[in-house]
């Protein structure tokens, strides 16, 4: 609760917190670079613009390389399940969580199927439910990896199997959403990876995803 006080007015405003927990496509990585889109371009920022003045605040928690439950031995702190409970506590009370992870889980050194990645997502959903049964969850299956993402000049951490696994996430996540009574959105239905790196959203992709997410949040 935020208290605002001036010489003529004192009132309380209760802001609803929406935690967006994801990877580089929530962080807003610019395709083919190590730079970040500005807040006015990122899908999280676009949502915040539309919800401004309506009692909502967006908490951006996107991290490049983040997975659901897998440890990245090359980069520390990427295991989503290791951090999510802390974030839920530090930002409490959280009204909603928008959860979009799974792309990095498709990397070759995890060797995970879509079904196993789905179990990782279940773990995260269970963590949210444990923190607060009243938190409303929007589970988003990520965009698909582009064909040839493994080719020289792109991302060698993926291969052909990675692309196939990414294509299977939509159906798996939808079942998880039904099991745990989550809202569901398939990012692959509204956006696709950029031609620049075959992996990340471009400006148009961020715009399309923001519009789709807003549609679910407003329902």
Descriptions of predicted regions:
Residues 1-8, 131, 137:
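Short intrinsically disordered, low-complexity coil segments enriched in acidic
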Residues 54, 78-219:
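Alpha-helical cap/lid subdomain in secreted, periplasmic
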């Amino acid at each position: 609760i935020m208290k605002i006080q001036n010489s003529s007015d004192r009132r309380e405003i209760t802001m609803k917190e929406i935690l967006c927990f994801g990877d580089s496509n929530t962080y807003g990585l610019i395709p083919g670079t190590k730079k970040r889109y500005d807040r006015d371009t990122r899908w999280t920022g676009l949502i915040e613009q539309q919800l401004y003045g309506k009692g909502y605040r967006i908490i951006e928690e996107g991290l490049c390389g983040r997975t659901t439950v897998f440890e990245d031995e090359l980069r520390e702190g990427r295991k989503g399940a290791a951090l999510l409970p802390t974030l839920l506590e530090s930002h409490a009370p959280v009204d909603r969580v928008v959860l979009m992870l799974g792309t990095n889980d498709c990397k070759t050194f995890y060797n995970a199927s879509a079904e196993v990645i789905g179990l990782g997502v279940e773990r995260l959903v269970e963590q949210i439910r444990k923190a607060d049964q009243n938190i409303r969850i929007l589970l988003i299956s990520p965009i698909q990896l582009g064909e040839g993402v493994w080719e020289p000049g792109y991302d060698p951490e993926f291969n052909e199997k990675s692309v196939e696994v990414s294509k299977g996430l939509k159906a798996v996540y939808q079942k998880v959403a039904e099991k745990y009574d989550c809202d569901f959105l398939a990012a692959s239905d509204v956006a696709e990876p950029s031609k620049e790196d075959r992996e990340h959203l471009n400006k148009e992709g961020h715009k399309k995803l923001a519009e789709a997410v807003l549609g679910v949040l407003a329902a």
